[in-house]
Amino acid sequence: MSSTAGTRRPRQITPTSPSPSPEPQPGATNGSSSTINVAVPSASAPAQVAPSQVAAAAATPVDAAEAVRINLETRVRSVVDLLYQLAVCSADVQEGSQHLVANKVNECIQALAALDATKDELHRAHMMIPQDVLEMLDTGKNPDIHTRNFVNRLASENQYSYGQHRAVERYKATLDAALDQAFPELKAAQAESTETK
């Protein structure tokens, strides 16, 4: 894929494309500073994740959550690739090639089982997805709504806390002024103590 003036062209899906899944960005892992090289299965290779790849990803010096995320991402991409390959195989079934579709179905089942096995790793790595996000996905809503609502709630709570802080500061200033007026000798003693510090 050629790049023109540093910009990437969007990937075009054609009937001969290996997969509709996006190509990984070179040297980037979704904004994280650490890089882990996990081989993404291609259309010509078996789409199963080898245990050596998982072990290699876990052996690199990064936090456990990042390794689990990369493992999960690799397995999901593998499932998407296999489903795409299954669609291509089943769209063009010819005499004597029925076994290809059956093999792809079996590979999909194995990849889905491997993906299901990662749920225990997610719990161990404390990668909990908020229940609201899962419910939004189940109802077909955009999960970005949860992020927007969370940020709006956080901003309003921040404004409320800031208002309380300002009210306490104003009360302290009013109290200091009233104490200075009621006890002038206390004001002089306080001024001397601040000068000595």
From Swiss-Prot:
Function: Component of the Mediator complex, a coactivator involved in the regulated transcription of nearly all RNA polymerase II-dependent genes. Mediator functions as a bridge to convey information from gene-specific regulatory proteins to the basal RNA polymerase II transcription machinery. Mediator is recruited to promoters by direct interactions with regulatory proteins and serves as a scaffold for the assembly of a functional preinitiation complex with RNA polymerase II and the general transcription factors.
Single GO cellular component term: mediator complex
Protein name: Mediator of RNA polymerase II transcription subunit 10
Location of region: Disordered: 1-39
Binding partners and assembly: Component of the Mediator complex.
Source organism per UniProt: Mycosarcoma maydis
Protein family per UniProt: Belongs to the Mediator complex subunit 10 family.
Keyword tags: Activator, Nucleus, Transcription, Transcription regulation
GO molecular function: transcription coregulator activity
Annotated localization: Nucleus
Listed GO biological process terms: regulation of transcription by RNA polymerase II
Coiled-coil regions listed in the entry: none
Highest taxon of the lineage: Eukaryota
Comp. bias regions, Polar residues: 27-37
InterPro entries in UniProt: Mediator_Med10
